Amino acid sequence: MKRIGAELDIEPVTEPQLEALLPMIAAYQGFYEADDIRAERNREFFRRFLAPSDVGEMIAAWRGGELVGYACMYWHFSSTRAVETVLMNDLYVDEARRGQGIGRALIEACADVARGRGAHHLEWATTPDNKTAQRLYDSTGAERSTWIEYELGL
């Protein structure tokens, strides 16, 4: 567990905590207008990120015993650099708790996990219209990628 200040704890998500996290995962998915949000599917999908995991890790931020945010990382690779990277695929802070440094603390905790794995870098993306997130990301010292992403529906 990583204690940030006197009141914010960030730790890997455990099986019992996953249940408490499901509504927040659904809120994150709703923010990005995901279709067909179902707790059972989310439970099965995100269970694979509980430590120890070969695919990634979920961490959660707690303040006074209350869940206030989470991040989900995927172990990733860069073939152009022949290195391991970490993809922070999800970062979400409860709407009522935004602007309190929780998102920044979660990013820093993800960076710590990535460093601990010997990863070359931590990477993430957001939508072009999520200006609030972009302001946070721009303030972390991270550089905007020059890559353009594509998605092919299957």
Predicted region positions:
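A short beta-loop-alpha structural element at the N-terminal edge
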Residues: 9-23
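Conserved acetyl-CoA-binding loop-helix of GNAT-fold acetyltransferases
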Residues: 93, 99-112, 139
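Residue-level recognition of the GNAT/N-acetyltransferase active site
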Residues: 89, 94, 127
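A short helix-loop-beta-strand connector motif used in the catalytic cores of GNAT acetyltransferases and
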Residues: 48-60, 87
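Conserved GNAT acetyl-CoA-binding A-motif
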Residues: 115-126
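Conserved beta-strand in the GNAT
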Residues: 60, 66-75
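Conserved GNAT-fold acetyl-CoA-binding loop/helix
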Residues: 26-48
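A conserved beta-turn-beta hairpin within the catalytic core of GNAT-like acetyltransferases
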Residues: 77-88, 98, 145
